[in-house]
Structures are given as C-alpha cells and as structure tokens.
Amino acid sequence: MDADDTPPNLQISPTAGPLRSHHNTDGHEPNATAADQQERESTNPTHGCVNHPWANPSTATCMESPERSQQTSLFLLKHGLTRDPIHQRERVDVFPQFNKPPWVFRISKLSRLIVPIFTLNEQLCFSKLQIRDRPRFAGRGTYGRVHIYPSSKIAVKTMDSRVFNRELINAILASEGSIRAGERLGISSIVCLLGFSLQTKQLLFPAYDMDMDEYIVRLSRRLTIPDHIDRKIAHVFLDLAQALTFLNRTCGLTHLDVKCGNIFLNVDNFASLEITTAVIGDYSLVTLNTYSLCTRAIFEVGNPSHPEHVLRVPRDASQMSFRLVLSHGTNQPPEILLDYINGTGLTKYTGTLPQRVGLAIDLYALGQALLEVILLGRLPGQLPISVHRTPHYHYYGHKLSPDLALDTLAYRCVLAPYILPSDIPGDLNYNPFIHAGELNTRISRNSLRRIFQCHAVRYGVTHSKLFEGIRIPASLYPATVVTSLLCHDNSEIRSDHPLLWHDRDWIGST
C-alpha cells in the first residue's frame, strides 16, 4: 500500500462481549409503513435540524460527487475489495472503506419533533465483503463470531440476525460519538464502526494488536518494567475515563460492559509493550440513558428520498434492566451491590437509566480494570501467588447472589488499604477507601450484616499476610491514584475530581 492508503493499525477483541441473549429486536421494523413514509415526505427536511445535537447544516447532503466516488472505487479495487451495489444507479458503485469515516449519520428531518430521522453514511453500507486476505478466526460468542484480516487490519463480526439490528444501532450511535469526541475534545479512545452489511449481518471494526487481558499476561512475564510504561498506563486510563464520560454525558450512551476484554490496544512494539492506542469497544450492552435524544430515532439507509432500509431504535434500548446492570456483578460499585443486597434503589426502578448512575457504573468498572492491570500485570513477580481483585466466581457457580455481593464488598474493604494510596496530590482531606465498619452500617438486615462481618474477618485472617507482601513501585503511584479515584465510594468523586480532568503534570512525563 502507498503511505496515504494505509488504514489505521487497529483489532477487535476475539472475546469482546459475546452476543447476549437479552437483546430483543422486536422494536425494529425493516421497512417503514406507508403512513410513516407519507409523514416523512410531508415533513420539512431542514426544520429543527440546527438545534439537534447531531445536526450539521454545512454538510446537508449524504451523496458524494461522481469524481470522489470514482476515486473511492479505484482505491478499493486496487486492494481487492468488491461488493454488489445496494441499489442500481448510474454513477460508479461505492465500496466499503477501511479508514475512519468523517461521519456516520446526519439529521435528515424531524417527525413530530421527538422522532429524529437520520441518513446513514452510504459509504459504510456494503452487500458483500471480498478481501484478498486470509482471515484468522478470533473467537465465537453466543450469537456471533469474529474473524481478523491481518493485512487489511480489520475485524469482521458476523452476528445472529436476532441481535444484529440492536448492536448495529448501538455501534452507529457510539461511532458518531467517537467522531465528535475526536473533533471537539481530541478524545480518540472510542472504537469507530468502519462498515456494516445488512445482508450478511456483519460489522466491520478496526483491528488492534491485543486487548487488555492479553496485555496483562504479556506484562506479567516481563522481569523489569521501565518507569515510563507505568506512567503511560495511568495516562491511558485517564483517556478512557474521558471517553466514557463523553459517551454518557454528551451522547447519552452507557456502556455497561467495561472490562479488560473490551479495551483494545496497539503497542509501540511487543518488546517494549508501550501502549500507543487504547480504545473502549464492544457495544453489545450499550443502553441509552436519560441524556439521550435518540430514544425514538430512525435511521435510513440509501437515498434520503427513497431509502432502501429503515432502522428504528427499539423501545427497550432505553429501558433499564437491573438484571442487565448486574450482569458483571463483581465490577459494580458499592451502591449498586447494596441496592441488590437491600432490595432498594435501582432494584425497584423501571424507567430510563439515569445518566449519573450509568456514568458511575462505567467509571467504577474502568477502575476495576486498572486494578486488574496492577495486580495481575505488575505485581505477580513479588508475591508467592497471584492477588486477584475479587473473590473467585467458581465458589458461587459463576452466578451473582447476595452472598457473593457481600463477599465481594468485604474482600474490597480488606484489600484496598494495601493497594490504594493513603493520600493523593493536592487533596489533604481525601479518604481513599471505605472501611468495613462504615459499609456494614449501610446493610439493612441484621442477618446480612453478620454474613458481611464474617467475610471481612475471614479475609483479614486468611489474606492479611499475603497482602502485607505487596510493594507498590513508586512508578505505579499515578496508576494507584487513578484507581482510587475511579473506584471511590462517592460516585461524584469518580466523575468530577480535578485530578481526572486538569493538568496531568502530577503523573510525570512518559
């Protein structure tokens, strides 16, 4: 490839978020009804667009020029890409492109003021993918499988038709957010969709060198780690925190599946393991929170006047399921686990997920991922056995139960003083972690309090000697500070503490 033709050096995780059975596509309608079509045709196509968050009046058309279309076709034919046309037209057909698109969707019109109708970027839609590159099978989930095309540096996720539309819409919304985050704030930590096929039920994403799980394994095998690698890890997770905050607050999207397996990385080289790119991906569980303006959105594929396909955001996309929130129970913040234990709060909530709750969940899970990097990637060499961030699932049959929730909270209380710093830069009154006695007062039933106390005492007896052997290198101090902030008991500190957003001089140069 020529230098200008090289697509970004990117990978999707082979195990990133297996497709879940909870997805429901009943809200999708493959084609608009006659009444809907008549209403859209009678609606002023520019009315209300300027004030809509996705509106871009300077780029009102989705059709590219014949010259640009021909250039795109020649570029992709050069690299062995072909596809059948979505519909017949006189100009040269358009082929999928593997660089990040300049836009994913644009406002077309508004229907009844609360139903935005968007036009999807036609360049993202293809009928069939043909690449002169031998794919590598990367993994299989419940409803799909992933293949990596190493030379083209793309990952193709082929999905079951029952969940395809839901994840496609999630990816469309998050990808437009990825582009906006880069343009407005320089945030580049959100995976962007490169293409999709309605016919073959495929999603195209960039391919990355590895996910964070693999990075932890590689890091744990290193005998020595340069200080700048540790500081880089702190920078990377601050970038990811900003990306999740942008998704939640600006796009109205809560990820709900933040974990090491869904954080994808590029490294400078496999010898140094210095991270050059880190992004959050896998939109299987994304939920629209109370800040979303797209809960009733319609996406049209093809010519806006005569769309080939119509995608509708399903009604349950913005309905919070507490069972879904708890799907990764050991990643959840204390307030969510306490709601589950006490049967209060979100357990009785049936509306749209509050934005502040969604952000608190995502950031806490991100902090747990960073804690995993520290414990399993950086400390194994100094301890006789590995220290994990949670109790092992196999004791509980890999299912969340009130006893596992109590066990998890007790384990965190005992582990935290050995890992998290007692103070942080510029905050003399900072309390880095919650103690078992304080947490015990927030458990409503006496019987459950006794269980929690038993777990805490047990871990103090069985694990204190192991934890006392932990020595945090000075170069890891910034990473432990970030962990402390993201995993703080106070959800407001998680999202708004100045160290997360202000100058990062306190970390030191990388």
UniProtKB/Swiss-Prot annotation:
Its EC number is 2.7.11.1. ATP binds at A138, G139, R140, G141, T142, Y143, G144, R145, V146, K157. It catalyses: L-seryl-[protein] + ATP = O-phospho-L-seryl-[protein] + ADP + H(+); L-threonyl-[protein] + ATP = O-phospho-L-threonyl-[protein] + ADP + H(+). It is found in: Virion tegument; Host nucleus. It is an enzyme of class 2 (transferase). Residues 1-63 are annotated as: Disordered. PROSITE patterns: PROTEIN_KINASE_DOM, PROTEIN_KINASE_ST. The keyword Kinase applies. One of its GO terms (cellular component) is viral tegument. The active site is at D257 (proton acceptor). GO terms for molecular function: ATP binding; protein serine kinase activity; protein serine/threonine kinase activity. It comes from the Viruses. Belongs to the protein kinase superfamily. Ser/Thr protein kinase family. Displays a substrate specificity similar to host CDC2. This is Serine/threonine-protein kinase UL13 homolog. It comes from Varicella-zoster virus (strain Dumas) (HHV-3).
